[in-house]
Structures are given as C-alpha cells and as structure tokens.
Amino acid sequence: VEKVFATTSKRILKFKTGDVVSATLLHKEGLSSQITAILKTPHYQRVTIFGDKGWVELIDSSHPDTPGPSELILRMNNGKIKKTNLNWTDTVSANINNFINAVQRKKEYIFTDEEKFQNVAVLDAINKSSLKRKVINIK
C-alpha cells in the first residue's frame, strides 16, 4: 500500500474512534481497495479490491468474533459474477492460537514480519488520514 485516504464518523456509539470507518487504499501494483466497517446499525464490514480484470468483494455481517454469514463476490470484465456464501470461522481464536504456536515454535506464524509491519503502517495511515482529512503516503 502506497497511499491511504480514510474517514471516520461518530453516529451512535461513544467510541473515541467512532463507529464508522471507510478507507481507500492505493497499492504499488496499481490496484485500489476500499475498506468499510460499521460497528452499529447493524454491524457491517466490507473489503473490495479493484483490479484491471475485475473486482472482488467480501462482505461480513458480523464482528469477527461473532458468528454470522459472509459473502464473497467476484466480478470479471467478461460480465460473469460468482457469489459464494461463506460459513463463519472464529478467526480471532485461530489467530491467537497460531500466535501461541509460533511463540512455542510449533508452527510458523501466518503473517511474515514484513506483512505485520505493513499492516501497522496501513492502520497508522488510516488513523492519521481520518484525523487530518487528507491522503497519507506510506513510506
């Protein structure tokens, strides 16, 4: 990710960070992606990645630690649409267990150090962009 523009809003919840976040990410490879999360009215999370041959979107209707349906939509330039309903998986517990196994040297952690640093940089840029209301470049 090279650039991030994000906004947040406080509608119902009293969270310091607000209850709605929307971020546009511009990637080095030329792709762009959109992340949206609404923590109330009801909960909604969406990640969409736009490429030159089509787009893919994942929609979650519940928080990662709460059972609920997800839908994956793939739309290609040829007009074909593929929709897949996904069953809930407890990714929060799976990540914690994977981390414990990595600390105990039983398994490799699912994210490389480079991916972890990039994730932190993106989250930091989302925070800065939402506060400054401008595009943030990631170095």
Predicted regions located by residue number:
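Structured beta->alpha junctions
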Residues: 39-41, 88, 115
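Short loop/turn segments at connectors of secondary-structure elements within structured domains
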Residues: 43, 66-68, 132
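Generic detection of short hydrophobic beta-strand segments and adjacent strand-loop junctions
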Residues: 82-86, 136-138
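Short polybasic amphipathic segments
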Residues: 47, 64-77
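Contiguous beta-strand/loop segments that form the cofactor/metal-binding neighborhood of enzyme cores
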Residues: 1-64, 95-108
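Active-site loop of classical SDR/Rossmann-like NAD(P)-dependent oxidoreductases
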Residues: 84-97
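C-terminal helix-rich "cap/oligomerization" subdomain common to oxidoreductases
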Residues: 28, 98-139
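Short acidic, glycine-rich loop/turn motifs
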Residues: 25-29, 73-80
